[in-house]
Amino acid sequence: MARESRESTTLDSHSAEDQMELLVIKVEQEESSPLAEETSWLGSPGPDRSRQRFRAFRYPEAAGPRQALSRLRELCRQWLRPDMHSKEQILELLVLEQFLTILPGELQAWVREQHPDSGEEVVALLEYLDRQLDDTPPQVPDDDDGQELLCSKAVLLTSAQGSESSQMEPVEPLLKQESLGSLPSEVRVTHVGHCGEDGVTATRLTSELQGLLKMEDVAPVLSPRWTEQDSSQMNLYKDGMQEHSGSLVSLDQDMQTKVRDLPRAEEYRDQKPEQTVCFLGEDTVPIPTGAEASEQEGKLQAAQKSATGTRRFYCRECGKSFAQSSGLSKHKRIHTGLKPYECEECGKAFIGSSALIIHQRVHTGEKPYECEECGKAFSHSSDLIKHQRTHTGEKPYECDDCGKTFTQSCSLLEHHRIHTGEKPYQCNMCPKAFRRSSHLLRHQRTHTGDKDFFVPEPYWESQSRVESHWENIETPVSYQCNDCERSFSRITSLIEHQKVHTGEKPFECQTCGKGFTRPSYLIQHQRRHTGKKTSVTVTPAVHSEVGVQLSLN
């Protein structure tokens, strides 16, 4: 009894060691596989690779339970990417994986070759494949079409088998030795890349590893109507395949070396159609181009639209996509500069009709957006949103440097200039520059003396416009006094000087009643009464032409 116990213990230890050796071999094969080299070269594994690593992880690979749990969390994060994906996107990834898992083995592998991003794309691919196969009758292929038909069927099956082997998942035998016994054993399809615009990719199929084709196993997967054929029709089609099987021959070693250098399936999106060919024995079959390729692409887009209910329209200039063709047509006007909608009042043109409607409110005075709190109305919805923040106290725009918050993004941009020191608004008549356009306008009045001078803020965004604007304004070089012919560079200086001739002293001390021509003189005088530097309010005289009132700290 003890001997049997020792033997069982020895067998268990040997079994555990064998399992560990298998796991080590599997990990080494995984690390040395071309896909691992590819992912290490790219810097991070793709979604499919990350999912496989998460599913293939086993407890013996870790040093302990804590390390195993930590490793699982790391692999799961690499697969689902919670830092980039939302909860809905993560849920879609899990549903997509389960959807692919429940598909039949051959069909599942073919769908994985297409790299779908959602379950709706899987549905579109399956419905498209089923319609394509339903359009092909199960008849004996002619000499001209036999090779092409046989290649298309074999490509569908072998692409699935090649995908499963590359993903390191258990592969069920796709081809069996039980039927088509007369088919030569050297028959194989060599991987040559893209075989048509429908995204089907052929992969290598060796009869030594996978056996021969069995119609009874493959037909139900391709389309449900194959199961409705009687035995005579199945045998007839089988004989046709046997007759044309000789055309599927392997390429020589030199050609296989060249084939391995061809781009992968996902790179064919950027490859020109005329550069892609499908080799069949010694014949070269060009991929459909031009109108034929556009027709196939249109069928696939129609299938995707019928399955998902959506269709994307892409701009060739910038790649932006739209759900409706009208949106794409409107977007193209940005590149062409076309503005078909013109205002009848002022002649200003716009790209879209909605922009014209909003502009017309300037002329009509319409303000359809009303605040429910205070009843104030606005012509733009964005203005109403900004106004409502005054009631709610919301300040969504925060400065990264000091943490100060603002209700509008433009206020945050102006505030940033305090930290950066940027002063984009420069006076064209003197070296002074300002952070705000309003400060520039206020400063320009010291040169022109025009109190009503105003230019809208967006107008000053371009420095060239500022320069061209001031070139068109005729301003005197100096301001001359009519009494003594003294000249001044600023009109404010001239006004202060004229008080010398008129004897006007508009700034009066409230304590003793003494008057002064300048507010600075009054401030100095009031310090004699207070004996310290305090806040002083300077009030001009009643009949003063200047009318200056200021508060100094």
Swiss-Prot record:
Q: Which domain of life is it from?
A: Eukaryota
Spell out the residue ranges making up region: Disordered. Answer: 28-49
**Signal peptide from the UniProt entry:** none
In the record, what terms sit under GO molecular function?
A: chromatin binding; DNA binding; DNA-binding transcription factor activity; sequence-specific DNA binding; zinc ion binding
Q: Where is this cross-link: Glycyl lysine isopeptide (Lys-Gly) (interchain with G-Cter in SUMO2)?
A: 176
Q: Which CDD domains match?
A: SCAN
Primary location class: nucleus
Q: Give GO terms for biological process.
A: autophagy; lysosome organization; negative regulation of autophagy; negative regulation of cellular senescence; negative regulation of DNA-templated transcription; positive regulation of DNA-templated transcription
Q: Which family does it belong to?
A: Belongs to the krueppel C2H2-type zinc-finger protein family.
> What function is annotated for this protein?
Transcriptional factor that binds to the consensus sequence 5'-[GT][AG][AGT]GGGG-3' and acts as a repressor of autophagy. Specifically represses expression of genes involved in autophagy and lysosome biogenesis/function such as MAP1LC3B, ULK1 or WIPI2. Associates with chromatin at the ITGB4 and VEGF promoters.
Q: What name does UniProt use for this protein?
A: Zinc finger protein with KRAB and SCAN domains 3
Q: Which gene encodes it?
A: Zkscan3
